[in-house]
C-alpha cells in the first residue's frame, strides 16, 4: 500500500515519512513493519503492514485538496454549542479520524470559541495538539511554501 519515502498522516500523532519496511520477529512470528519517522516528535513508529488499514493511516493531502480545507476553515459553519464535556469528546473523536478536514474543523471551532471566552485547559491542549498535527501535514505537502503555511495557520 505505502512505499518507502511516502508522506503519511497517523491520527493523533501527526505527519511522518515511511523510512523503511522491515521484517521483525515477535513471539516467534515474522511480520513486515512500516518504519515511520514522525515529524512532530522525531520519534520512530513501527506498524505491522497488515494493520495499516485499521490504524487509519493515510497519505498526506495534495495542494489541490488543501484549497477545499481552507474554504472549510475560513467559511464553514461551527458545530452547535455543546456542554464542554460533550464538545471535548466530539472534538477528540474528530481528531482521532485522522482526516485533515475534521482536524481543521476542530481548530476553527476552538479558535472561534477562544475569541468569545477563554478555553479551559483541556480545550487549550486539544487546540494546540490539533494545530501541531495540521502544521506537520502542511509541511509535507509538495508545492507548498512556508509562507503559505503561516498564512493558513
Question: Over which residues does each language-model region extend?
Answer:
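A positional/architectural concept
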Residues: 1-55
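Charge/polar-rich, low-complexity and marginally structured segments
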Residues: 50-153
Amino acid at each position: 500500500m505505502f512505499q518507502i519515502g511516502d508522506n503519511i498522516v497517523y491520527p493523533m500523532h501527526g505527519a511522518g515519512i515511511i523510512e523503511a519496511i522491515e521484517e521483525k520477529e515477535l513471539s516467534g512470528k515474522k511480520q513486515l513493519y512500516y518504519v515511520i519517522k514522525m515529524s512532530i516528535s522525531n520519534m520512530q513508529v513501527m506498524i505491522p503492514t497488515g494493520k495499516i488499514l485499521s490504524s487509519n493511516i493515510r497519505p498526506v493531502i495534495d495542494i489541490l485538496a488543501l484549497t477545499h480545507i481552507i474554504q472549510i476553515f475560513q467559511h464553514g459553519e461551527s458545530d452547535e454549542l455543546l456542554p464542554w464535556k460533550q464538545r471535548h469528546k466530539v472534538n477528540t473523536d474528530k481528531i482521532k479520524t485522522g482526516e485533515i478536514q475534521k482536524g481543521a474543523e476542530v481548530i476553527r471551532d476552538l479558535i472561534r470559541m477562544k475569541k468569545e471566552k477563554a478555553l479551559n485547559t483541556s480545550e487549550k491542549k486539544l487546540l494546540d495538539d490539533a494545530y501541531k498535527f495540521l502544521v506537520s501535514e502542511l509541511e509535507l505537502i509538495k508545492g507548498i511554501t512556508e509562507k503559505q503555511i503561516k498564512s493558513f495557520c
